[in-house]
Amino acid sequence: MGHTDVVPVNRDGWSVDPFAGERRDGFVWGRGAIDMLNQTAAMAAVFKRFASGEHRYPGDLVFLAVADEEAGGKLGARWLVEDHWAWVSTDYLLTEIGTPALAGRRGMGIPVTVAEKGPQWRRLHTRGAPGHGSQPYATSNALVPMAAAVAALGANPPGAHITEEWRRFVEGWDPPGDLAADLLDPDRIDAAIDRLAFDDIGLARWVHACTHMTVSPNTLHGGVKVNVVADRADAEIDVRSLPGQDETDVRDHFRKAIGPAFDEIEYEVVEATKANGSAPAGPLWEALTSAISEVAPGRHLIPAMIPVGTDARFFRRRGTVAYGVGLFEDRVGFGDFLRMFHGHDERVSEVSLSMTADLFLRTVERLGEQV
């Protein structure tokens, strides 16, 4: 399963037309190149080979290309799972995300998405009364309490929390020196993240997001005109919860961060999905392990939790084992790759497209030998 929709762009930050699909220096450039048109294209190419009879699978093989993952999946994967399960019912699922390899003391490891944090999107609303902007004395300006609330959320981030999913990832990665121990200690991990940021800000952001509930105020709207006192303000906050956390934990954090003013703000739950995952064991995991040994000898799998949400969560609710994986050459490192997600100059190498398609093909073939 892949998605075909992409997020908007700011063209000023791009060195190419973000929607031209330009091929340059061995890369395909454009919005969605790694999120996730690369994997979707590889899946389509592999599915064609099975559909044409060139390769065979002893069961049903379904290819899904959905168009609203970036908007929450309500009209795509969620609709298919909830309203048309008979069409898409599956025991195993391959989807996003795939990343380049990570170097550790065990060698190069391929992160495989086996779990993901929970999207817990929130909206805050404040109300005031309109008036002339030239006479603000004793007015009720909705922007003022909203600005204070957003600032409080930014100034009071949640602390580190080490989950079993994170321990499993660090053990599989096995980074050099004392880094592994630092990354598993809630009292030392923030300092370790700061050190990582000097050399690799993309990796540092990943580590931080995988070990903290994250709270990111990303939109703020209020008022209608510069000379009118704002009678309404609205903010949207992207919250991502860790395994074991739920709606109550999110609300408790907002209340603690904002303080008594929280009770004067309208708090809206937009999305409330818990973290979810699949065990890194069983036929699909074994098929992936075999496929990697064939197409990337000497590399091993690292079960990873990702800080983003994917459409896999809808299938996992039905008991489907869902993983995200890809295979990439080493021209772009793990951290630099992550920085391109929803960023400028997104691109994927043509060699990586071929490698990912080969991995998918071998994985399906090896799974077919087991089921």
Predicted regions located by residue number:
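Short pre-catalytic strand/loop immediately N-terminal to key active-site residues, enriched for Gly-Thr
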Residues: 24-35, 301-302, 344
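Acidic-enriched catalytic cores of C-N bond-cleaving enzymes acting on peptides and small amides
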Residues: 85-87, 91-92, 98-107, 112-121, ...
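Acidic/His- and Gly-rich active-site-bordering loop/insert found
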Residues: 1-31, 40, 52-59
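Short glycine/serine- and small hydrophobic-enriched flexible loop segments
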Residues: 45-52, 148-152, 239, 362-365
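Zn-dependent metallopeptidase/amidohydrolase metal-coordination segment
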Residues: 272-274, 298-368
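Acidic/histidine-rich catalytic neighborhood of metal-dependent amide-processing enzymes
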Residues: 27-28, 34-111
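Serine-dependent amide/ester hydrolase catalytic core
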Residues: 233-247, 251, 255, 262-307, ...
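Active-site-adjacent substrate-binding region
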Residues: 150-158, 178-184, 279-329
